[in-house]
Amino acid sequence: MPLELQTFFYKDKLKPFSCTNLLLGIILIALAGFRLIRNFNNLVDISFDDEVQYMRYGMELFHNIRSDWGPSYNLWYKLLSLFEQSPIELYLLNYKVVIILLPICLFAFLYVYGISFFISIWIGFSILISTTNILTYPRISHVVVSFFLLVLVVNRLWIKSKSRQLILLCFTIFVAAFARPELMLAFLILLAITLFYILKFDDLKKHIVFALPFVAIMILIFAVFRLPSDSFKGIDRAYIAFCQHYTIKNIIFNKGHFNQFIDWIAISKAQFPGCTTFTDIVINFPLVVIKGMFINIGFYLQLIISICTDILFPFQLLPFNKIVLLGYGFVVLFILFILFSKKQRLNLFNAINSNKYLFLVLLVFVLPSVISSLVFFPRMHYGIFLLPILSFVIAILIDNLVKGYKIRIGLVLFLFALFMYKMPTIKKYNTPRLLTNDECPTQSYKEVIKDLNQHTDKPHVIFSNVLSFSLMIDKNFTDFSAEYDYDNSKTFMEQMKAHQVDYVLQTKFLTEDRRLSKDSTWLQFMTNPQAYGFKKKKYFDDCETYLLYKE
């Protein structure tokens, strides 16, 4: 490739870069990704909850604009719906796209910021088949992190002005905050840094024209959606997050016999009387919050070690899974080696110093997820935000360890062929699916939804403890949720009539609902549903899940 073209694609002549290698790496990871997701739609079941709400609100975007559930992620689904209109197919399409998109963006980010081609593509391949990439749910963090990395790549390749780089990053994180609301904190911090940098080291007037389109779009977004929503179904989102994970930790440490999907509401009202927001809990029960944070630190360290292991080792290539424990041990030893090696500490310090603006941006970006993990719980989708900074630090350290060794492209291609040969299918992974507490190997909710799609000629109301179940059905179904809609002061029969329920999805989780098990009208209904005009349809022979319906 002519030197002029390389210079056009890459501003820093001091570090080796090849546009050809960049494109080659993207193509190789994409090919591996296509092999990974082959026969995907036949092997992967659907799940519900948060992801289905994002999807449905995206499908309805512009006809019905919702500001309370990730509107910028809704827009992503709207774009994908140009290719698939069926909810099931759209859900699976998004799943496939983000599985491949994230490792491609991570590889490109590492390579254009000076990491060697071999280390960059190794990490890209490793993340592609990792449980961090494939099993993390919901998928919203994949999209947010991918676009953040993409903007960093654009900044490195085509935008020379640091002020303009910061302006573009501010815009990106502002839009991302309407997918993950906690990122509004990152936006405000980065905005302050951007204004400080421009006013102190640059001339604001030079960048007004560049910034105007982004500012106009931000104003439009704010005018339509206001601030990112802090509530869900009228309940403070922070309160929901804290109380759900308080219940989960209660189950883990106290062997509590609770259903985390339903009982958290009753437990929270009993444990935190008079509290309706997370702020109320902080004010009235500060020691509970502090104790929870110390517990979360331990879980967060485990999450960091798990992600570092996924970055370093493509374990899924091996036929046995217990070797991952060796990986955890190796990561711990690797971290200790870096901490105790003066040379490696110095190398890392020099790398941070030479990329101080990048590290500052990465830290600002990851800060809200760190806070959320420590205050609420370190869920895997918070861990996705750690990928850019952890991958970059690990890549720098490995590059320094192998400095002076040049790995030829031929070896990379040989390893790629070996990787493709040994690569697992998606069937190896326990992909997200609906949890009903049933031992049911044949359970596939795609079949349930496809059957319900045959009955969309008139409106129906379905009672279940599956959040957003009806949103996966094509049309004319609405939910009466056992988790959020059920009124404990009324009997089941009163509510069934009031809400005109004509479908009931019965699962083992619903059977274990302590509220319903004490309700005589529910017990009578389940004993003899035919007396109320309901018929039973059992989809699976090996579990308790079945459907009750009125014709």
Language-model regions, residue ranges each:
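Membrane-lumen/periplasm interface segments of specific transmembrane helices
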Residues: 209-313
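Transmembrane-helix signature of polytopic, membrane-embedded enzymes
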Residues: 106-132, 147-148, 161-166
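Extracytoplasmic catalytic/substrate-binding loops of multi-pass membrane glycan-assembly enzymes
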Residues: 36-55, 64-89, 230-240, 436-445
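Extracytoplasmic
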Residues: 443-504, 508-533
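Hydrophobic/aromatic-rich transmembrane helices and adjacent perimembrane loops
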Residues: 59, 142-145, 179-180, 185-188, ...
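Aromatic- and kink-enriched transmembrane "portal" helix at the membrane-lumen/periplasm boundary
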Residues: 39, 67, 71-74, 88-95, ...
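Membrane-embedded, lumen/periplasm-facing catalytic core of multi-pass transferases
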Residues: 55-58, 110, 247-249, 416-470
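Signature aromatic-anchored transmembrane alpha helix within multi-pass, membrane-resident enzymes
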Residues: 25-28, 121, 164-171, 191-192, ...
